């Protein structure tokens, strides 16, 4: 199996509920290592740029507004099949459809306030990691 990196956001709703540690525990229990992390309060420009692919969609303005409503925790995760594993841990985008025990089933409020974000493919992971982290900020743990 291939060692991959993926990008992850703990969104404002989960940060405000003090769920960072619980979510990190799930990542690490699944064999994913945090190799870069920082807390930030996204500016409108950062959020708009990050979610540029959704511009023009009905939910775009609300998404940018939500993602700038409070601090987020962003991280790079590394491990075997990290993208697939992370997406399994997160669960379906709509928490009503998420399997029991997934992050969204446990912690999400709604499809709009769904606790976490994760890259969906290697290309998006590379783009999203580079959007927020320089190479010098990433610390492989072997």
Curated annotation (Swiss-Prot):
ATP binds at residues 11, 59, 87, 93, 104, 114. GO terms for biological process: CTP biosynthetic process; GTP biosynthetic process; UTP biosynthetic process. The keyword Transferase applies. It comes from Aeromonas hydrophila subsp. hydrophila (strain ATCC 7966 / DSM 30187 / BCRC 13018 / CCUG 14551 / JCM 1027 / KCTC 2358 / NCIMB 9240 / NCTC 8049). This is Nucleoside diphosphate kinase. One of its GO terms (molecular function) is ATP binding. The active site is at 117 (pros-phosphohistidine intermediate). Its cofactor is Mg(2+). It catalyses: a 2'-deoxyribonucleoside 5'-diphosphate + ATP = a 2'-deoxyribonucleoside 5'-triphosphate + ADP; a ribonucleoside 5'-diphosphate + ATP = a ribonucleoside 5'-triphosphate + ADP. It is found in: Cytoplasm. Its main location: cytoplasm. It holds the Pfam family NDK. Its EC number is 2.7.4.6. SMART domains: NDK (SM00562). InterPro entries: NDK-like_dom, NDK-like_dom_sf, Nucleoside_diP_kinase, Nucleoside_diP_kinase_AS. Major role in the synthesis of nucleoside triphosphates other than ATP. The ATP gamma phosphate is transferred to the NDP beta phosphate via a ping-pong mechanism, using a phosphorylated active-site intermediate. Belongs to the NDK family. The keyword Cytoplasm applies. Homotetramer. Keywords: ATP-binding, Cytoplasm, Kinase, Magnesium, Metal-binding, Nucleotide metabolism, Nucleotide-binding, Phosphoprotein, Transferase. It is an enzyme of class 2 (transferase). CDD domains: NDPk_I. GO terms for cellular component: cytoplasm.
């Amino acid at each position: 199996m291939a060692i991959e990196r993926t990008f992850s956001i703990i969104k404002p709703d989960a940060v405000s509920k003090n769920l960072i540690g619980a979510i990190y525990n799930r990542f690490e229990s699944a064999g994913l290592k945090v190799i870069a992390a920082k807390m930030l309060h996204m500016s409108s420009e950062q959020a708009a740029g990050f979610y540029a692919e959704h511009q023009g969609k009905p939910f775009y303005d609300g998404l940018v507004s939500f993602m700038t409503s409070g601090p987020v925790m962003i991280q790079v995760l590394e491990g075997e099949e990290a993208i697939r594993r992370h997406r399994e841990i997160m669960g379906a985008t709509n928490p009503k459809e998420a399997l029991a025990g997934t992050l969204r089933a446990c912690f999400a409020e709604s499809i709009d306030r769904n606790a976490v974000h994760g890259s969906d493919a290697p290309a998006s992971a590379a783009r999203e990691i580079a959007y927020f982290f320089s190479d010098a900020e990433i610390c492989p743990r072997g």
